[in-house]
Swiss-Prot record:
The gene is rplM. The lineage of its organism: Bacteria, Bacillati, Actinomycetota, Actinomycetes, Frankiales. SUPFAM superfamilies: Ribosomal protein L13. This is Large ribosomal subunit protein uL13. Belongs to the universal ribosomal protein uL13 family. PANTHER family: LARGE RIBOSOMAL SUBUNIT PROTEIN UL13M, RIBOSOMAL PROTEIN L13. The keyword Cytoplasm does not apply. Residues 126-147 are annotated as: Disordered. Keywords: Ribonucleoprotein, Ribosomal protein.
Amino acid sequence: MRTYQPKPADVQRAWHIIDATDVVLGRLASQAAQLLRGKNKPYFAPHIDTGDFVVIINAGKVAMTGNKREQAKYHRHSGFPGGLRSTSYGELLDTRPHVIVERAIRGMLPHNRLGRAQGSKLKVYAGPTHPHQAQQPVPYEIKQVAQ
């Protein structure tokens, strides 16, 4: 008997919604990356996009352990000499919290065309509202130990 290889037409995509309130950033990112890749499905294949859509709400209330809010830095470069800009995660969490969550999750996806396609199914919102009610997303609970 041959091993089943899923076809792109066979993939059934579900919508998951994750509330990021008081969830540690790394644990949230790893669970979301697994859903985006489709590793929770019995027909997962590493070369086919079998993942689901993931909506993350309350990204501004995500938890960080240790002193990462003050010490961890977000860097971006304009491409010009002297164009490096750094911002602490605390400042970024106050102004643009979706950036921190998106970067953490996309860093756990493959760094190729397939990873970009999987990352496009990620929707992150800083507050509790989102425009995806029509898709009827299923709540996904992240189980974590006490902090």
